[in-house]
UniProtKB/Swiss-Prot annotation:
SUPFAM superfamilies: RING/U-box (SSF57850), TRAF domain-like (SSF49599). It comes from Mus musculus. GO terms for molecular function: zinc ion binding. Expressed in heart, brain, liver, testis and kidney. Belongs to the ZFTRAF1 family. Keywords: Cytoplasm, Metal-binding, Zinc, Zinc-finger. The gene is Zftraf1. GO terms for cellular component: cytoplasm; nuclear envelope; perinuclear region of cytoplasm. This is Zinc finger TRAF-type-containing protein 1. Residues 1-13 have a biased composition (Gly residues).
Amino acid sequence: MSGAEEAGGGGPAAGPAGAVPAGVGVGAGPGAAAGPAAAALGEAAGPGIPDEAALAGARQLQEAAGDPDAPPKKRLRAAEAAEAAAAAVAAGSGKLEERLYSVLCCTVCLDLPKASVYQCTNGHLMCAGCFIHLLADARLKEEQATCPNCRCEISKSLCCRNLAVEKAVSELPSECGFCLRQFPRSLLERHQKEECQDRVTQCKYKRIGCPWHGPFHELTVHEAACAHPTKTGNELMEILDEMDQSHRKEMQLYNSIFSLLSFEKIGYTEVQFRPYRTDDFITRLYYETPRFTVLNQTWVLKARVNDSERNPNLSCKRTLSFQLLLKSKVTAPLECSFLLLKGPYDDVRISPVIYHFVFTNESNETDYVPLPIIDSVECNKLLAAKNINLRLFLFQIQK
């Protein structure tokens, strides 16, 4: 199996970059201690006092907003962030977690990191996903990867993890999607899976066909009144036959995937869909990845929301569809199977679906096919993110 061959042409460095105060986790080199990060966090905790980290953050955001070489979207987002930071400093108040957000966020995507946090030699922070994308883009362009903030060189040997920031981020509060209460980010997953009284659960009689889904605190009442335990054997056999058919389809899918994994030519890569707008009078949102190389060919992925309907914002049901485009020339038809799965740093739920297409110079793009997201809630999670990070698998079928 070939290794991950990642996208070129812009990379995360081209996305909006917010400045992060260099006092947080700054070290003289990869081996530097993370003590300054803890000191900055302690200073930021002072109630009602505009700390140096917040002031420095506001100044650097203003500089990023005024940078004439920065992309327009980056300048706009940096200007908005600078206004918010300046307002927080002027007020000298606000919740600690809100003030720390701009200090601890990734300098590339401006989101709080979900996993590992890396820092350049000047202390600018990058989440694991953006860090990997910067390195991959530079490799494909045959350039030295640089920090999007200070332009110092970055690599796996020059950058180090910042454990102080990782631990600080894990303690910041985050809202439960079911009960809307706040918990430390490190405890939120366990709460949502095991403890939340409003989490969605299933009836214990689902094995004999009960379709009920509901909040956990209603489970006992439902199970006491559930009609499925009293059904006759003939009624249950009909339900079990339907469940067996569904199980057979699922097994057929996984057997097909295992068969594809035995192919000689297999490629995979992490892809990053970025949002764009059409030039129409009423603009429409669409997504596109930078060019990337897999199986020695150049490709691009595009995606659209609700099949580009006129007003997807008025629909309660949200879907994404995508197409794969071959950008390089081929001397013979290229028959491939492909599928998209969630990326290594995201938690979106996607059901694997295998698609098949024969690429030629005349027919070099697939039709739009559904991105098999579990439901509209998962789709909204993707749409709410600044970028959509997925993993593409390509299997070349040889005659």
